[in-house]
Amino acid sequence: EKKNLWLHVDACVGGYIAPFVRMNGADIPPFDFKISAVKSISADLYKYGYCAKGASTVLFRDQTLYQYMIFDCDNWPGGRMITPTLAGTRPGGAISAAWAVMNYLGVAGYREKQKQVTDARQAVEQGVTQLGFDILGSPQLGIVAFSHPTLDVYAIYQKMFAKGWFSGLTTEPKALHLMLSPFHMSVIHTYLEDLAASIEQVKAGETGTVGEVRYS
């Protein structure tokens, strides 16, 4: 605010879960328009909004700021072209589907879905801690990462992959990385059983190699 800079919040993953987790009683730190310097927020509907891919949102503090998003060009032979974004023609199916999902779930539906997510995350945290893993940071929403103080996490991942579990990995530090959904609560018990078995395999000397691909 002192520098009169536009502060944008990239809430593409957490934007449609954090407000409802807060409504459910969790102490979620301010990240949104509660902070006076925040001018805009992006949040993907296809993640924790549970909508089809192809629909996302950008929110502005007030209507006057929206003008800076509009693409307005007349420096070409086709005449003046104005679109809400840099993109031209976009299919409306994903937008219509998002409208239907959001109206169907409503605030109560989203609160229930996000409670299922945080319940699943807490169950994972408890289970992996009992297996000797260390939780990275202090998860509050639907993502959790955990490392092991003595075992090769990538070797454990390889064993889990062979059992049909396709999760993410982090590199610094090495950790298993999960993005949980309401469905996952029903499979956590099986996941933890397979994780325990994978640990025993690695302890017994069954190791392998895991290639590295970075997302940027």
Give residue spans per PLM region.
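Active-site-proximal loop/turn and secondary-structure-junction residues that shape catalytic pockets
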Residues: 11-15, 47, 173, 182-184
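Active-site C-terminal subdomain of aminotransferase-like
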Residues: 8, 13, 20-140, 147-150, ...
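Non-catalytic terminal extensions of PLP-dependent enzymes
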Residues: 111-114, 118-125, 129-131, 137, ...
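Active-site core of PLP-dependent enzymes with the aminotransferase class I/II
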Residues: 1-3
